[in-house]
Amino acid sequence: QGYSSAASDVYKRQEYIGVDACAVNLMRPAMYGAYHHITVMGKEDQPCDHMYDVTGSLCENNDKFAIDRYLPKVDMGDLLVIHDTGAHGFAMGYNYNGKLKSSEILLHEDGSFEMIRRAETPKDYFATFDCFDIYNKINFDA
């Protein structure tokens, strides 16, 4: 009686793009896998021939804006635009892990843009603390 055995290993090389945004800024992809189009500024006309996971800065495994997303080659310092976040970013935002809410930028059809909500500051974050007199002890101007 003979035996036959085979072993197989599968290696998947995955490339990641870590961004300074996170689920605090846009919770929908982390909660239920919502799709948001992502572009790389200045590379809109380049081929989307590199596959990435676009990950946020939280220490949570579901803090991802995209999984297996084809984008142009992304280099350190490139700016990514996560589209169509309008009503969901700030309204669903929260301060998990002490993360501050980001500013909101409106991209107009003609390509111009404007800031419609400033970024949250540490002073904003601590303004509602009402214990240990912490707000008055922090030097926000340092």
Regions found by a protein language model. Give the residues of each.
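Single conserved hydrophobic/aromatic residue that forms the stacking wall/gate
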Residues: Q1-A7, Y11
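C-terminal accessory subdomain/extension
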Residues: K12-I17, A21-A142
